[in-house]
Each structure stands twice: as structure tokens, then as C-alpha cells.
Design a protein with these regions (language model features):
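ATP/nucleoside-binding phosphotransfer catalytic cores, i.e., glycine-rich phosphate-binding loops
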Residues: 173-217
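N-terminal glycine-/serine-/threonine-rich phosphate-binding loop
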Residues: 1-36
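Glycine-rich N-terminal segment of FAD-binding domains in flavoprotein oxidoreductases
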Residues: 32-52
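Ligand-binding beta-strand-loop-alpha-helix segment within the catalytic cores
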Residues: 1-4, 58-125
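Class I SAM-dependent methyltransferase SAM-binding "motif I" and its flanking Rossmann-like core
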Residues: 124-126, 130-169
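A glycine- and small-aliphatic-rich helix-loop capping segment at beta-alpha/alpha-beta transitions
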Residues: 50-58, 84, 139-147
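A short secondary-structure junction signal
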Residues: 107, 135-140, 189-193
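Glycine-rich beta-strand-to-loop/alpha-helix junction loops that act as flexible
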Residues: 38-43, 126-130, 182
Length: 217
């Protein structure tokens, strides 16, 4: 077990979502300005709904997405579209992903926008795929080799050919990083998280001083 991994277990997905909101609220109360990286997928949807219900004003919070499918943010499979639809608030201070036909330019542009607007990466919430991927750092893909701090294009051929993903170096720089992994279908990968398996999630954990896994399994 990687020593820098903290594991918190709750009985249900709902309890995990409520605890995550409590933990992040404690962080938000400590800072005048705050940044939080959000993920797509179905796992964090309840947490986002609870967050939106608790906070009605976001002027001191800057949101960014840890990865994005290489599509316009009006497309149904866009992570930012999903997040914005849940918050249903035009005042949400989300650093917008601008689609360019060239995924490399899209990644470079988002890197510039995020690094210009965020001086300190306070929190990020990440899921973990069945194959151990985090953000869009999938096993056996080129993005795993990047040594830059920012975002890079990554060819994955899952739903879309390309993804734009935060790099290990950016995620390693986040002060408090939560792996939010729930559901019966995640039992197998949860057993591998924090062990010496050659998975992207474990490489990320190894790069950080502390990572928190929140799960119901």
C-alpha cells in the first residue's frame, strides 16, 4: 500500500457525496479565493447537485475541468456541458474549454487559460476508471509520458478519438486531491488502488504527498 494514500469508507454513494461536500466546504471556508477541478462521468453528479444546492454564489470559486472530450462544449458528451447543466447557473466561474479542430491547439489553449487564471490549485475531484485511468490518463497512451504542467491531447478512441487531459505534473500540484470511486462495479479496481500495480492512478498517488480515496466499497 502506498503510504501517501488515505482511504475513507462510507456505507453508500450518497454518504460519500455528502462527506465530500463537507470536506470541500471546510477547504472553501479557509480561502478568500478558491479553485476546484471537476470531472465528468456519473459518479460525481450527486455531489455536484449537493454543491449547487449549498452554494448559490460562486464569485470566489474558479472551476476547471480535469479533462474534456475533444468536442464542442455544446455537445451532449462534453464534460463541461454536463457540469454546467447540473449547476444550471450562468454565474458559474468555469474556465471554458474552447474547441479547436486540432486537439493539440485545444490543449495548449486550455493550458494557457487555466494557468493564467489559477495561481494555486486547491482541490480536484477525480474518478478512477475500471482500467485505472484518472482524468484522461489512460494506460498505454502518450499523455502518460508528458513532463509538462498543464493539458495535453491524448488519443484514446473511447467515445471520441481524442481527449484533452491534465497531466501528472498538474495533478501532482493540486493541494488536496480526492479520488471519488463508488459502486459495485468498482470493487476490482479499488483493490488495486494504492498497491504496486502499474496503473495511472497509482503513478499519480506516488507523485503526491497525500491523496484521499473516498469509496463505499
Amino acid at each position: 500500500m502506498i503510504k501517501s494514500l488515505e482511504i475513507i469508507k462510507e456505507k453508500t454513494h450518497e454518504e460519500c457525496s455528502k462527506l465530500l461536500l463537507k470536506l470541500i466546504s471546510n477547504h472553501i471556508n479557509e480561502f478568500e479565493k478558491f479553485s476546484i477541478g471537476l470531472s465528468g462521468g456519473t459518479t460525481p453528479e450527486l455531489f455536484y447537485k449537493l454543491f449547487a444546492k449549498k452554494y448559490h454564489e460562486y464569485s470566489n470559486i474558479t472551476f476547471w475541468t480535469v479533462d474534456e472530450r475533444h468536442v464542442d462544449t455544446t455537445e451532449i458528451i462534453s464534460n463541461q456541458k454536463m457540469i454546467n447543466s447540473i449547476f444550471n447557473d450562468t454565474k458559474l466561474n468555469m474556465i471554458k474549454y474552447d474547441y479547436n479542430e486540432d486537439p493539440r491547439l485545444s490543449a495548449e489553449n486550455y493550458t494557457t487559460k487555466v494557468l493564467e487564471k489559477i495561481n494555486k490549485f486547491n482541490i480536484a475531484v477525480l474518478g478512477v476508471g475500471d482500467d485505472g485511468h484518472v482524468a484522461s490518463l489512460f494506460p498505454n497512451t502518450r499523455a502518460l509520458e508528458s513532463d509538462k504542467k498543464g493539458f495535453v491531447e491524448n488519443e484514446v478512441n473511447i467515445l471520441t478519438k481524442w481527449r484533452i487531459t491534465s497531466t501528472y505534473q498538474l495533478l501532482a500540484d493540486v493541494e488536496s486531491l480526492y479520488l471519488f470511486v463508488t459502486g459495485e462495479n468498482k470493487k476490482e479496481v479499488i483493490q488495486k488502488i494504492g498497491n504496486e500495480d502499474d496503473l495511472p492512478v497509482n503513478k499519480l498517488i506516488g507523485l503526491r504527498k497525500k491523496t484521499t480515496l473516498l469509496t463505499d466499497q
